[in-house]
């Protein structure tokens, strides 16, 4: 069983959904970023979704762009990020760890050597935000070669054909978009996802985690009530980092409070 399968099985037994926070690795710097990831897990995160800093994150709103800039300004490189992820993997051997990133970063390293590096760091899944299913063949092949789950986005506008491809090609979990547009906590998630969840189930997709605009416990509860296996929250987490860059300990305390509250909302 993969780490994701084990996580979903464990949560099912407890009658809970998954809460998965997203952060950019090395935001605001490598050392604090490690403490942030540790705090997220210790406060109840079921898995981590991580970004590798990139100068042009297309699908992201200003909050996550800011995280990328802070990380790059601190001297972050993909290698430093992989090192930090490797340390988290060593500390939490059962934690599912996913990357959410852009194709340029994969290309710049060479597709195969990128996935090989992921496997070495103990990463479970990779979602490439700007690669749709119909352009994904070489990424999926490399992912499978190195035992990494390829993750795909199921957008609210998706045709049945796209949802079928997402279901067949994806592994680990399915990233279900609550709305179109860029990421951000300002624009709340819409929740008419029942139809999509029905279709994904019909096509036997990996469990769906709802993302984009998830910033409060009530939305986590709603996502799970609608039939999602859990929720992903990125911009709301990164906003806490942004607000307390000068107060590292307060930042960790606030992140801990946020994650605990979001995780509590996953109880069915």
Curated annotation (Swiss-Prot):
InterPro entries: Aldolase_TIM (IPR013785), RibuloseP-bd_barrel (IPR011060), Trp_synthase_alpha_AS (IPR018204), Trp_synthase_suA (IPR002028). The active site is at 49 (proton acceptor), 60 (proton acceptor). Its EC number is 4.2.1.20. The keyword Cytoplasm does not apply. Signal peptide: none annotated. SUPFAM superfamilies: Ribulose-phoshate binding barrel. The keyword Amino-acid biosynthesis applies. Pfam families: Trp_syntA. Pathway: Amino-acid biosynthesis; L-tryptophan biosynthesis; L-tryptophan from chorismate: step 5/5. One of its GO terms (cellular component) is cytosol. Keywords: Amino-acid biosynthesis, Aromatic amino acid biosynthesis, Lyase, Tryptophan biosynthesis. It catalyses: (1S,2R)-1-C-(indol-3-yl)glycerol 3-phosphate + L-serine = D-glyceraldehyde 3-phosphate + L-tryptophan + H2O. It comes from the Bacteria. GO terms for molecular function: tryptophan synthase activity. Tetramer of two alpha and two beta chains. Belongs to the TrpA family. The alpha subunit is responsible for the aldol cleavage of indoleglycerol phosphate to indole and glyceraldehyde 3-phosphate. This is Tryptophan synthase alpha chain. The gene is trpA.
């Amino acid at each position: 069983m993969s780490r994701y399968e084990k996580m979903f099985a464990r949560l099912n037994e407890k009658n809970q959904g998954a809460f998965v926070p997203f952060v950019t690795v090395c935001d605001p710097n490598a050392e604090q970023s490690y403490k942030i990831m540790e705090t997220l897990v210790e406060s109840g995160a079921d898995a981590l979704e991580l970004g590798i800093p990139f100068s042009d994150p297309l699908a992201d709103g200003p909050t996550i762009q800011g995280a990328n800039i802070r990380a790059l300004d601190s001297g972050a490189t993909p290698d430093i990020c992989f090192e930090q992820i490797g340390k988290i993997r060593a500390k939490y051997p059962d934690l599912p760890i996913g990357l959410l990133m852009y194709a340029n970063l994969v290309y710049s390293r060479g597709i195969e050597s990128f996935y090989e590096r992921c496997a070495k760091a103990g990463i479970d899944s990779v979602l490439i935000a700007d690669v749709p299913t119909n352009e994904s063949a070489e990424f999926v092949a490399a992912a499978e070669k190195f035992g990494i789950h390829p993750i795909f986005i199921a957008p609210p506008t998706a045709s049945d054909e796209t949802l079928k491809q997402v279901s067949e090609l994806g592994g680990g979990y399915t990233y279900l978009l609550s709305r179109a547009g860029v990421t951000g906590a300002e624009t709340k998630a819409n929740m008419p996802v029942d139809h999509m969840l029905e279709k994904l189930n019909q096509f036997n997709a990996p469990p769906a985690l709802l993302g984009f605009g998830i910033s409060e416990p009530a939305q986590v509860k709603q996502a799970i009530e609608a039939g999602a296996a859990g929720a992903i929250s990125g911009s709301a987490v990164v906003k806490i980092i942004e607000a307390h860059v000068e107060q590292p300990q307060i930042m960790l305390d606030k992140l801990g409070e946020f994650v605990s509250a979001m995780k509590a909302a996953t109880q069915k």
